[in-house]
Amino acid sequence: KNNDLPDLLSTTRLARLYPDEFEDLGQYVDTSIFEPQALQIISQNYLTDKLSVLPQQFTITNVFYNKDAFEAAGLECPTVDDRWTMDEVYEAAKKLQDSGAVKYGMAMDASRARYDNLMYMNGGSLVEKDGDSFKVVADSQQNVDTLQSFVDANNSGVMPKAIWAGGSSDNPGDYFKNGDVGIYFSGSWNYNPFVQDITSFKFGVMPSPVGSAGGSAILGGAGLAVPTNAKNKDLALEFLKWFYTDKN
């Protein structure tokens, strides 16, 4: 609003809030180097074909699991070719808990960055395109079914109930690191800390579950953008052309 943005910036949503204030970067780089889904999630202006942002990083949900607990409960990790549904995840979580190998079968960060993927797996969304605008569809049957399954699992005690019920500030990541949780939905950024911190058991990352509409692991992320009024716009665009090549 103050017209004082840098020539090149990393942003999650500025370019969508003010699309006319940023360059269309699709004309400067070869967008075929990106997965189409990545462009849609990070870069696409939903009302036009303009690419105001080029993907830089993603918000990805990993499904961590306690290998030792799986072995104790007689469970095998799903494969890429035979991924679990969320119903199967809930069932496995109950088996883990019932086996006594862990206190809680599963846990999930109290964040939309985790839950919304469950919604997308079943073809749900909070809004959908309606002509040149959007309409709210938060109460669609897909969303209701997804939420009910999650609430039922949470109420059953297979998860640390208070984390999503709002009665606790506990970090579910600590539960997993302590060996109290069998399956943990969290950010991919937790992988390196877990490698450093977890020494009492072996852990892994399982393939993302699928729903009736497929899988979903990427909720959003950030990308690089260039303001149309940037002082050194040409230099910023040259950098992006150099940066977004296979070599670099």
What are these regions (language model features)?
Residues K1-R16, D30-F34, C77-P78, S188, ...:
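Conserved N-terminal structural module of periplasmic/extracytoplasmic solute-binding proteins
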Residues D24-Q37, T79-D82, G124-D145, Q196-D197, ...:
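Short, solvent-exposed loop/beta-turn-alpha elements that line the ligand-binding surface or hinge
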Residues S52-V53, Q97-A110, T245-N248:
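Bilobed periplasmic-binding protein-like "clamshell/Venus-flytrap" ligand-binding domains
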Residues Y90-K95, D132-A165, S208:
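Glycine-centered hinge/linker elements that transmit conformational signals in sensory
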Residues K1, R83-E88, I163-K177:
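Short helix-initiation/N-cap motifs at beta->coil->alpha
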Residues D49, S156-V158, V195-N248:
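Extracytoplasmic/periplasmic substrate-recognition and gating elements
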Residues L8-N62, D87-Y90, L118, G204-M206:
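Hinge/lid segment of periplasmic solute-binding proteins
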Residues N62-Y65, M119, L224-V226:
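Short glycine- and hydrophobic/aromatic-rich loop-to-beta-strand nucleating segment
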